[in-house]
A protein has these predicted regions:
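Extended, low-hydrophobicity segments enriched in charged/polar residues
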Residues: 1-194
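Intrinsically disordered, low-complexity boundary segments flanking structured domains
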Residues: 152-158, 201-203, 212
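A general structural signal for short secondary-structure junctions and capping/turn motifs
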Residues: 157-160, 206, 217-218, 236
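Generic secondary-structure boundary/loop-capping signal
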Residues: 165-166, 205, 213, 224
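Generic structural "secondary-structure junction" signal
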Residues: 170-171, 175, 210, 217-218
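Active-site and NAD+-binding cores of ADP-ribose-processing enzymes
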Residues: 177-179, 203-213
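An N-terminal amphipathic alpha-helical segment
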Residues: 192-207
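Alpha-helical oligomerization segments
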Residues: 212-249
Length: 249
């Protein structure tokens, strides 16, 4: 041949549904399925490789993606008499959510750039030692380390459940039904935005309306969100084409 051409496969980054994963790995997707068993793995916390060579990241544990939360909230809004009033709870153990007394911050933002840049290298070394300095921390006086939430909220009482403490906020599920709900919540991650990250906020751990018509729970160690409520509400969630929801028997 006079010429040759190179054909490369396209890189695709998209969501993989649980039912699709079951088809790929030859398993069965059912209401009590767990990701590790569904993908024939031993853990839910690491990337797996499909039989045809694709890489698949595990689902988020302990929270819903922001767009899925908005979709779920839009459905739940129609199944309560108090869509504008209720409780939103966040697990206190999320990294950097709360301020604390300590020798250094709970996280640091390292900057990417030219490795040969001496200023950048010095900055990143400083950040590294500010997070962990085993030799000098023994002698360092503890000071207040800021979190995403204010000191007043960080030191406030908690909703104590077995093995879990939660920070509570008063708010309605209707506020979470907007696609950009994370822009107006008190726990918006503004420190991350100051370092160039897109606006974001943690998905709530627990949500319930004032009339207690239903409850949404994203347990921190679970790969799914569980919602309890009326048969009509469950049917609406299961029927939503953009959600992968199943009724628990």
């Amino acid at each position: 041949p006079d010429e040759t051409a190179r054909l490369v496969d396209r890189l695709v980054d998209r969501r993989l549904t649980w039912s699709e994963a079951a088809g790929i790995f030859g398993t069965v997707f059912h209401p009590l399925a767990q990701w590790a068993a569904l993908t024939r793995g031993t853990t839910t916390g690491s990337t797996i490789v499909t039989p045809d060579g694709r890489w698949v990241d595990p689902p988020l544990e302990g929270e819903l993606a922001s767009d899925l939360l908005a979709l779920v909230a839009s459905i739940l809004t129609g199944h309560t008499t108090t869509p504008d009033d209720g409780i939103v709870a966040l697990w206190e153990g999320h990294g950097a959510l709360l301020g604390h007394m300590g020798e250094g911050p709970s996280r640091a933002f390292f900057q990417m750039g030219d490795p040969a840049d001496p200023v950048l290298a010095h900055h990143n070394r400083m950040l590294g030692t500010s997070v962990k300095d085993a030799w000098n921390n023994v002698f360092r006086r503890k000071t207040w380390q800021e979190g995403i939430l204010s000191r007043e909220i960080s030191e406030s009482p908690r909703l104590e459940l077995p093995g879990r403490g939660h920070v509570l906020f008063r708010g309605g599920v209707s506020e979470l039904a907007r696609p950009d709900w994370f822009l107006d919540v008190p726990w918006r991650d503004r420190p991350a935005e100051e370092h160039g990250f897109d606006p974001s906020a943690l998905s709530p751990s627990i949500v319930w309306p004032a009339d207690r018509a239903w409850v949404l729970v994203s347990e921190v160690d679970y790969d799914s969100t569980v919602i309890g409520g009326s048969r009509e509400m469950i049917a609406a969630l299961v029927a939503a084409s953009d959600l992968e929801a199943l009724e628990i028997p």
